[in-house]
Amino acid sequence: MMCGIVDLGSNTIRLSIYQYEGEHFRLLLNKKTMAGLAGYVQDGALSDGGILVACRVLSSYRALLSNFSVSEMHVFATASLRNISNTGEAVEAIRDVTGVTVEVLDVETEAALSFKGAVLPGGVPTGLLADIGGGSVELVSYRDM
């Protein structure tokens, strides 16, 4: 099966397409669009222009996924939508325009998923993981993995 994962970040919106079978997965495509959503924040709120940029990118990713015959698309937002005053309105507007539901991750979930994604491929038993995004930084110290 194939699945599209979208990371709706403060500066970039990234699409990754994976082929997976059970616990095994393989990256087929990684596309990044410089959207600069952080630049559309005015008085703590994402402007209509910023929402429109997000909608355009998500719509183009949805079309790309249909070319790959991928029907499953999961969209996650981090600080880009978490740290604005109109999170609910932005998520609703994106859904209304694109039909895409955006899940806004809290800081703890973002850090846990970043950690899981970072240690899965390499199996490093002890370390410090730094996830540096456009609008947030998560640090995770771990040992005996």
Where are the predicted features?
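Active-site-adjacent helix-turn-beta-strand microarchitecture at beta-sheet edges
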Residues: 135-136
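Nucleotide/phosphate-binding catalytic cleft detector across ATP-hydrolyzing
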Residues: 1-10, 16-129, 140-145
